Amino acid sequence: MARFVVVPLFVLLSLFGLEAIQHPPKIQVYSRYPADNGKPNFLNCYVSGFHPSDIEVDLLKNGKKIEKVEHSDLSFSKDWSFYLLYYTEFTPNEKDEYACRVSHVTFSTPKTVKWDRNM
């Protein structure tokens, strides 16, 4: 009888332990194709390795939030950290600046990573 109580208790304690673990997200901003001014492309923000799962991700154009953005489903790795991909269509040019802004419990303020057209 004690064994039937100990196993579920161990599982519950393990789940609570996972919530206590915090890992900051790694943020990568890149385009699907090499940047070519005036040619349609996709801007991607890949956020990975974070825990817990609550996260806010915005793609920015000249510091303002881009409204038409899609994203993958929240997924997790073998180590129980999470990852997501946010993306939108865009047409690069010389004057506009693009970035990805991420808010997560591990950051005291949101972190913004700029798109480097040469990457």
Swiss-Prot record:
Protein name as it appears in the record: Beta-2-microglobulin
General function of this protein: Component of the class I major histocompatibility complex (MHC). Involved in the presentation of peptide antigens to the immune system.
Alphabetical list of InterPro entries matching this protein: B2Microglobulin (IPR015707), Ig-like_dom (IPR007110), Ig-like_dom_sf (IPR036179), Ig-like_fold (IPR013783), Ig/MHC_CS (IPR003006), Ig_C1-set (IPR003597), MHC/Immunoglobulin (IPR050160)
Key word Disulfide bond present: yes
Disulfide-bond pairs as recorded: C45-C100
Gene3D superfamilies (alphabetical): Immunoglobulins
Source organism per UniProt: Saguinus niger
Pfam family, one: C1-set
Record note on quaternary structure: Heterodimer of an alpha chain and a beta chain. Beta-2-microglobulin is the beta-chain of major histocompatibility complex class I molecules.
GO BP, sorted A to Z: antigen processing and presentation of peptide antigen via MHC class I; immune response
Main location class: secreted
Domain of life: Eukaryota
Gene that encodes it: B2M
Keyword Metal-binding on entry: no
Family: Belongs to the beta-2-microglobulin family.
Localization of this protein: Secreted
PANTHER family from the UniProt entry: BETA-2-MICROGLOBULIN, MHC CLASS II-RELATED
Signal sequence range: 1-20
Keyword terms: Disulfide bond, Immunity, Immunoglobulin domain, MHC I, Secreted, Signal
Gene Ontology cellular-component terms listed: extracellular region; MHC class I protein complex
SMART domains referenced in this protein's UniProt entry, alphabetically: IGc1
Domain (Ig-like C1-type) ranges: 25-114
